[in-house]
């Protein structure tokens, strides 16, 4: 059987079958179509404005690496006028994050973008290796998720940046829809499906330019552009519930390729059924960070961790309930050094 021609240009030989719609494309057309679809997502939602400073949440993985490469390309091609930088979080996981950060550092040079790295150790006095040693692997993702969200916000705030973009893709959003549907949690489903998100605890805007991009196509894009990315999964991330949702979605995708986007669209429709009430923002009485509660989630988790530490080890951290401890942590948070810019 002769090779199939590209369905778009009809000149080159097709080398890719798009997972999204089974369309056969040559390398050049696939890359252009992928970039054009991301551009359409950005423009149709008015995601950016000229002159905006935007931090790309960079982990060194395929999603954030592709996001950085595509945004750089589109920023130059369509003259978005964005000031882009890379913002990475060092959770303190030896053999994983230290290696992936080396990839991010190379990306910063390859894309000519400033890089800022914020560490859990500097912000909270705990690395994830230490957290796991204390609480075990079960439930450690809760700590990491809360700490990472606040670390991204703190890093962006230190830079004077009000917009952070992340590499969440269509598969991620579909999994979130499925999990929250099974939980019966419409408010969380609404937050998870929106292309622009944030939280009651932050005035930092977060968005997902790759929201409608399939994970498989992100891998194909990275491969055909020969992007430099880190492919090892986090050693502490079992994600039992999300893993079950992922397996179900992958099985549906095999039967019906459009299933992923169908689930995303259904989630968007369901999100309209319940209006999420806005919360009143204040500041955490311990660390001074924006919070809808008297004590923010990060400080609540840190209090539990620090109860098992000797007093001498936590005098400069959260855990002491007197006023001096709270002001000490606030000063510590304010003095975090952010290099690279």
UniProtKB/Swiss-Prot annotation:
Entry's EC annotation: 2.7.7.-
Annotated metabolic or biological route of this protein: tRNA modification; 5-methoxycarbonylmethyl-2-thiouridine-tRNA biosynthesis
The keyword tRNA-binding belongs to this UniProt entry's keyword annotation: yes
UniProt KW keywords: Cytoplasm, RNA-binding, Transferase, tRNA processing, tRNA-binding
Pfam families from the UniProt entry: ATP_bind_3 (PF01171), zn-ribbon_14 (PF16503)
Matches recorded under InterPro entries: CTU1-like_ATP-bd, CTU1_C, Ncs6/Tuc1/Ctu1, Rossmann-like_a/b/a_fold, TilS/TtcA_N, tRNA_thiolation_TtcA_Ctu1
A Gene Ontology biological process term: tRNA thio-modification
Molecular function GO terms recorded: nucleotidyltransferase activity; tRNA binding; tRNA-uridine 2-sulfurtransferase activity
UniProt cross-references to Gene3D superfamilies, sorted A to Z: HUPs
GO cellular component: a single term: peroxisome
Subcellular location: Cytoplasm
Function: Plays a central role in 2-thiolation of mcm(5)S(2)U at tRNA wobble positions of tRNA(Lys), tRNA(Glu) and tRNA(Gln). Directly binds tRNAs and probably acts by catalyzing adenylation of tRNAs, an intermediate required for 2-thiolation. It is unclear whether it acts as a sulfurtransferase that transfers sulfur from thiocarboxylated urm1 onto the uridine of tRNAs at wobble position. Prior mcm(5) tRNA modification by the elongator complex is required for 2-thiolation. May also be involved in protein urmylation.
Family affiliation: Belongs to the TtcA family. CTU1/NCS6/ATPBD3 subfamily.
Protein name in the entry: Cytoplasmic tRNA 2-thiolation protein 1
Organism this protein belongs to: Aspergillus niger (strain ATCC MYA-4892 / CBS 513.88 / FGSC A1513)
Lineage of the species this protein comes from: Eukaryota, Fungi, Dikarya, Ascomycota, Pezizomycotina
Name of the gene: ncs6
């Amino acid at each position: 059987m002769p090779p199939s021609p590209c369905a778009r240009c009809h000149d080159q030989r097709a080398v890719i079958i798009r997972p999204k719609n089974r369309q056969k494309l040559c390398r050049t057309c696939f890359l252009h179509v992928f970039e054009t679809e991301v551009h359409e997502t950005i423009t149709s939602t008015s995601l950016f404005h000229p002159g905006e400073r935007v931090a790309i949440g960079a982990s060194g993985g395929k999603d954030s690496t592709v996001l950085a490469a595509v945004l750089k390309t589109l920023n130059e091609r369509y003259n978005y006028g964005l000031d882009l930088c890379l913002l990475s979080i060092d959770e303190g996981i030896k053999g994983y994050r230290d290696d992936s950060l080396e990839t991010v550092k190379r990306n910063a040079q390859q894309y000519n973008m400033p890089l800022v790295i914020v560490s859990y150790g500097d912000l909270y006095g705990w690395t994830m290796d230490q957290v796991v040693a204390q609480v075990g692997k079960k439930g450690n993702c809760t700590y990491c998720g809360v700490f990472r969200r606040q670390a991204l916000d703190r890093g962006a705030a230190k830079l004077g940046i009000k917009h952070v973009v992340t590499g969440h893709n269509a598969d991620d959003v579909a999994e979130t829809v499925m999990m929250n549907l099974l939980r019966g949690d419409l408010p969380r489903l609404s937050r998870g499906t929106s292309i622009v998100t944030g939280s009651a605890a932050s005035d930092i805007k977060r968005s997902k330019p790759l929201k409608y991009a399939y994970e498989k196509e992100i891998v194909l894009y990275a491969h055909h552009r020969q992007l430099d990315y880190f492919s090892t999964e986090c050693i502490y991330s079992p994600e039992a519930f999300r893993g079950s949702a992922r397996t179900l979605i992958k099985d549906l995708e095999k039967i019906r390729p459009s299933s992923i986007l169908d689930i995303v669209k259904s989630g968007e429709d369901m999100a309209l059924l319940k209006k999420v009430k806005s919360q009143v923002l204040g500041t955490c009485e311990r660390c001074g960070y924006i919070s809808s509660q008297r004590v923010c989630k990060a400080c609540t988790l840190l209090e539990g961790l620090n109860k098992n530490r000797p007093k001498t080890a936590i005098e400069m951290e959260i855990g002491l309930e007197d006023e001096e401890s709270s002001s000490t942590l606030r000063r510590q948070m304010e003095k975090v050094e952010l290099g690279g810019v």
